Design a protein with these regions (language model features):
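Conserved nucleotide-sensing/catalytic segment adjacent to the nucleotide-binding pocket
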Residues: 167-234
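Glycine-rich phosphate-binding P-loop
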Residues: 106-109, 146-167
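Catalytic cysteine-centered active loop of the rhodanese-like fold, especially the PTP/DSP P-loop
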Residues: 67-126
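A short glycine-rich beta-strand->turn/loop micro-motif centered on a GG-aromatic cluster
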Residues: 99, 121-134, 174-179
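Flexible, polar/low-complexity N-terminal or interdomain linker segments that lie immediately upstream
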Residues: 1-37, 138-142, 147-151
Length: 234
């Protein structure tokens, strides 16, 4: 899909075809709970600020919440503009466009996009925001997929076998690698912190999408219990 100079909102399927860096403008705690894999978090509000603005929306009015949001954001404008420029330089070369999303594709992403456009950055918004992305993720698990499971006792080198058979016709999903957990015997000893179940699902969904785009014929993965540590297998 060619990237036109536009500030329109895109459905998930079209948004993912674009190549610009992805910016998640939600609060840090929202981002940690789950995000589009590869997205960069540039929060418009901190967790505390978001709570306060949400409270004014519920107890006072939408207009009051907007005023409070502007009052919070305006002093940070210079810092946000610098972060926007840094984000456009993360990939090789200079990207003059950004993909942006918030929770529902509302005022946070639109306000951030406006800031980016003031310094000549083209913006592409995700229609429906992260909420629509999560719907896309969960839909990936509803499909009838040609899954093959590898079973065996601990230490029988099942992961090595998966790595060996991985080729263009067979798509391998390393559940233990994604979950940062080696199963019941070794757990997460010596591994990085586990992702949330939500983020675990997001990463698997992206892998399933690669299965389709690469025209593979089978999906191979290691047979696991319903959970890998704190990650629940969808």
């Amino acid at each position: 899909m060619s990237e036109k100079h536009t500030n329109s909102s895109y459905l998930v399927t079209d948004f993912r075809k674009l190549t610009s860096p992805i910016v998640d403008v939600r609060s840090p705690s929202e981002f940690c709970q789950g995000h589009w894999p590869g997205a960069i978090n540039v929060p418009l509000f901190s967790d505390t600020e978001r709570q306060a603005i949400g409270k004014s929306y519920k107890k006072e009015s939408r207009l009051k919440a907007i005023f409070n949001g502007l009052k919070t954001t305006i002093p940070k404008t210079t810092k946000l503009l610098k972060l926007i420029l840094e984000t456009t330089l993360k990939d090789e070369g200079v990207s003059r466009s950004l993909r942006i999303y918030c929770w529902r594709g509302g005022m946070r992403s639109k306000a951030f996009a406006w800031l980016a456009r003031t310094i000549g950055i083209n913006t592409y918004l995700l229609k429906g925001g992260y909420k629509s992305y999560r719907k896309w993720v969960l839909n990936q698990f509803e499909a009838d997929l040609p899954i093959r499971l590898i079973g065996g006792k601990t230490g029988t080198r099942k992961t090595d076998l998966l790595n060996y058979i991985n080729n263009k016709n067979i798509h391998v999903i390393d559940l233990e690698g994604i979950a940062n957990h080696r199963g019941s015997s070794f757990g997460s000893l010596g591994m990085e912190e586990q992702p949330t179940t939500q983020q675990f699902e997001n990463i698997i969904a992206e892998s399933l999408d690669k299965f389709h785009t690469n025209n593979a014929t089978e999906i191979w993965l290691e047979a696991e219990s319903s959970n890998l540590g704190k990650c629940r297998i969808p």
